[in-house]
UniProtKB/Swiss-Prot annotation:
Family: Belongs to the RnpA family.
Main function: RNaseP catalyzes the removal of the 5'-leader sequence from pre-tRNA to produce the mature 5'-terminus. It can also cleave other RNA substrates such as 4.5S RNA. The protein component plays an auxiliary but essential role in vivo by binding to the 5'-leader sequence and broadening the substrate specificity of the ribozyme.
GO MF, any single term: tRNA binding
Annotated region described as Disordered, given as residue ranges: 37-56, 114-141
Lineage, top ranks: Bacteria, Pseudomonadati, Pseudomonadota, Alphaproteobacteria, Hyphomicrobiales
Species: Brucella melitensis biotype 1 (strain ATCC 23456 / CCUG 17765 / NCTC 10094 / 16M)
Assembly: Consists of a catalytic RNA component (M1 or rnpB) and a protein subunit.
First-level EC class: hydrolase
Name of the protein in question: Ribonuclease P protein component
Pfam family, one: Ribonuclease_P
Coiled-coil stretches noted in the UniProt entry, renumbered to this chain: none
GO terms, biological process: tRNA 5'-leader removal
Transmembrane region(s): none
Catalytic activity field: Endonucleolytic cleavage of RNA, removing 5'-extranucleotides from tRNA precursor
Chain intervals with Basic and acidic residues compositional bias: 114-124
Length: 141
């Protein structure tokens, strides 16, 4: 029998806040924050090298029924498909957008897998979106 990688949950506010300081990966269906844990953090949390995931669905997405449906769809997509792409000793926080409710399940799993495996991708090759002016004399002085 094939052993599945156990994916643990983020439950405490402090855990969510530390992941928030990590790398952000934006997509049309959700925003994903990713942070690698140090060995000390993994030992302190007694999680080993298992990946952990937390879900956030804000009230602007709808009432409790809609928010829970979005959360359940994301959990199932992680459990069935995208969980195998998760790196060990890494925490993920998924902030759902309203479009995650009506998107086809195949698109949801594909988008999750793409965002999980993307490491440090930037649109413009690492350059800033807006260029800063060169430092120089002020008012011709």
């Amino acid at each position: 029998m094939k052993s599945k990688k156990q994916i643990l949950r983020l439950r405490k506010r402090a855990e969510f806040l530390t992941v928030r300081n990590g790398e952000k990966r934006r997509g049309p269906l959700f925003l994903m924050a990713v942070r690698e844990r140090t060995e000390e953090e993994s030992n302190a949390a007694k999680t080993g090298d298992n990946p952990r995931v937390g879900f956030t669905v804000t009230k602007k997405n709808g009432n409790a029924v809609i928010r829970n449906r979005i959360r359940r769809r994301l959990k199932e997509a992680i459990r069935c498909h995208a969980g195998r792409d998760m790196a060990p000793s890494t925490d993920y926080v998924i902030v759902a957008r309203e479009q995650a409710l009506n998107a086809p399940f195949s698109q949801l799993t594909e988008e999750l897998s793409r965002r999980i495996t993307a490491k440090g991708e930037r649109r413009s090759g690492g350059k800033r979106r807006t260029e800063r002016p060169e430092p120089g004399p002020v008012n011709g002085k």
